[in-house]
């Protein structure tokens, strides 16, 4: 069973997906981390001098995998733990070099589908319910007001030691929203078969509770109450 969570940057997709997976006893797939790891690897070269074919080759030849579970889960790139290095503003600014290139996206999407074929999964990203898993059992579109999203992202960056103001973050998210909605491939789209969850003013647990209500309604026999309790 695959549950997808799509939505704009800063909506809390990773945090909510992680908690939802824990509650359900499912595995969690952070597809954004995979794109960030591929971008980090690309930045070890000179991306400005790389053709589209070279970008695709670098991504295809990069070994990206997850290690560990829960809060100790790390993302490895060619055997190196890059969990912290992929969260820098420089990586964020350059993700488009991988995410907007169809040939570079292909091996990442194939890897995501391979992972989903082996387990029950909660997966989040920008195109999970549209391009990667269009037949997912339940699809969510998680959003929040831009200001709230900016405050969440600001806290993450400040915790990581980056000095950014709230006004700068709001402007960055406005640009990111425009970019994500107008990307040539893998654009952020809200489809009719997605359940919209607005997390503005909600805690993570409250957001997850709303999602579980939807899962119970749409797939009543998929997850037993005992399994859900075990996941808490």
Language model segments and positions:
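N-terminal phosphate/diphosphate-binding loop that engages ATP/GTP or pyrophosphate donors
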Residues: 22-87
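The conserved Walker
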Residues: 9
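Small-molecule kinase domains that catalyze NTP-dependent phosphoryl transfer to phosphate-bearing small molecules
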Residues: 67, 112-119, 126-131, 135, ...
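Conserved lysine of the Walker
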Residues: 13
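ATP-dependent NMP and nucleoside kinases share a basic, alpha-helical "lid"
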Residues: 83-162
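Residue-level signal for inorganic ion chemistry
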Residues: 32, 79, 108, 122, ...
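Hydrophobic anchor at the beta1->P-loop junction of P-loop NTPases
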Residues: 5
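Hydrophobic positions on the alpha1 helix immediately C-terminal to the Walker A/P-loop
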Residues: 16
């Amino acid at each position: 069973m695959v549950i997808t969570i799509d939505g704009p940057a800063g909506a809390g997709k990773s945090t909510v997906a992680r908690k939802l997976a824990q509650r359900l006893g499912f595995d969690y797939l952070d597809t954004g981390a995979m794109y960030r790891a591929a971008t980090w690897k690309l930045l070890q070269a000179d991306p400005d001098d790389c053709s589209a074919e070279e970008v695709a080759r670098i991504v295809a030849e990069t070994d990206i995998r997850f290690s560990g579970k829960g809060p100790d889960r790390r993302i490895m790139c060619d055997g190196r733990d890059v969990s912290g290095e992929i969260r820098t503003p420089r990586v964020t600014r350059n993700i488009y070099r991988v995410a907007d290139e169809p040939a570079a996206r292909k091996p990442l999407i194939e890897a995501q589908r391979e992972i989903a074929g082996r387990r029950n999964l909660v997966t989040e990203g920008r195109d999970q319910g549209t391009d990667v898993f269009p037949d997912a059992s339940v699809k969510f579109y998680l959003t929040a007001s831009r200001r709230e999203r900016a405050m969440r992202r600001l806290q993450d960056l400040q915790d990581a030691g980056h000095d950014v103001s709230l006004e700068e973050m709001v402007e960055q998210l406005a640009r990111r929203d425009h970019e994500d909605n107008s990307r040539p491939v893998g654009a952020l789209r809200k489809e009719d078969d997605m359940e919209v969850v607005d997390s503005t003013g909600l805690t993570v647990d409250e957001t997850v509770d709303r999602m579980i209500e939807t899962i119970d309604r749409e797939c009543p026999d998929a997850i037993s109450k005992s399994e859900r309790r075990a996941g808490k």
